Amino acid sequence: MIDTVDTPTTRHTVASTALGDLTLVLDGDALTGIYFPGHWTRPERAEVGRQTDLADDPLATEVRDQLVAYLAGERTTCDLPLRLDGPALHQAVWTRLQQIPYGETTTYGALAEELGAAPQAVGQAVGANPVSVVVPCHRVIGADGSLTGYAGGLERKRTLLALEEPAATDRGALF
């Protein structure tokens, strides 16, 4: 959940991308959320602040531009100011997700082992990632290589991994 309710600088806008219209939630000078239509952890309307015009918000425009470039294969990362609120384990998982290189995947079990946490707890933290794509939770797959869980839907996860697959050619398939 986003802990910026009733903050006057909390705002949201919608950005059109190759993955569909994304709701971008910003607070002050930081990105706090990216939500797909039908996203299973989408915050309540009151939690995303006032609506802002994308063209009038430099940070929102920068987020959109970096996401569009990433989805076009022109970037391998997004370099954006983030403010991610959550429990300590979630913070640790989200930090580790940012270290998974473009074109590579890991498993929930491997993350759990690295972090000394239960796989189910790690899975919950991955699923609670408020900034999908920027914090690349789509790079986490099942132990058997299957695509499991993605708040934006498995088809979007498949699309993101397929986008990154050419970078993995020398290392083998992503999934």
Q: What does each of the following model-derived ranges do?
A:
Residues 1-117, 165-175:
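Basic nucleic-acid-binding alpha-helical/helix-turn surface characteristic of O6-alkylguanine DNA
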Residues 125-126, 130-134:
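Major-groove DNA-recognition helix of helix-turn-helix-type DNA-binding domains
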